[in-house]
């Protein structure tokens, strides 16, 4: 009877925006980080860095999650006092707020989705460019424009009045997002490493090397792309 007279649907709807925000941030960051680390591990197989990163990934993948979360809370929240331990905001800052926290969560979700879509289209637009320097420059320019657009978004119009509240929520999200990302990226990294090591044995990789293609191009355009399918499939099943 703690939440009476609210119905279960009302309670779920009340907490859904903050759940979706955390879910979106963790999945985007962990998938990108895991895939990036995984392809580097496969490419540098046999090296000392590959050994240590693989051991770290296996530890993250097999660690007991409740214990690890408590250790993160103890170290970053209690011992170092860098990050807040409980709740998702400071109640005293929201006492006179003209809107509910869910409004800020919805705005932050929209912002993350828009920025992610823009970066995806920048990547798709530049991926077939032959010149590595041109590709890097265009992606860097796209990133700068995205950052400028984000700054304008949060400093103009209706979002300006909500910026401080969004920063409060974002500050409280650092620790949970980081903690879940550390344990979530490992599965993607290990799967990417395994599938890419199989791909590197294929004949077309040997052909690409014989044609004199750069190591980066062989890794990113030939090996990593073909290793991506099972990784994306696993990622989709994880979301579902």
Where are these regions (language model features)?
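Transmembrane alpha-helices
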Residues: 197, 216-240
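Hydrophobic alpha-helical segments of membrane proteins
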Residues: 24-28, 32, 67, 71, ...
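Transmembrane-helix boundary motif in ABC transporter permease subunits
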Residues: 26-57, 69-74, 125-130
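Membrane-water interface segments at transmembrane-helix boundaries in multipass membrane proteins
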Residues: 56-63, 67-183
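An internal, D/E-rich "acidic patch" concept
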Residues: 1-35
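Membrane-embedded alpha-helices of multi-pass transport/permease systems
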Residues: 33-36, 178, 182-196, 200
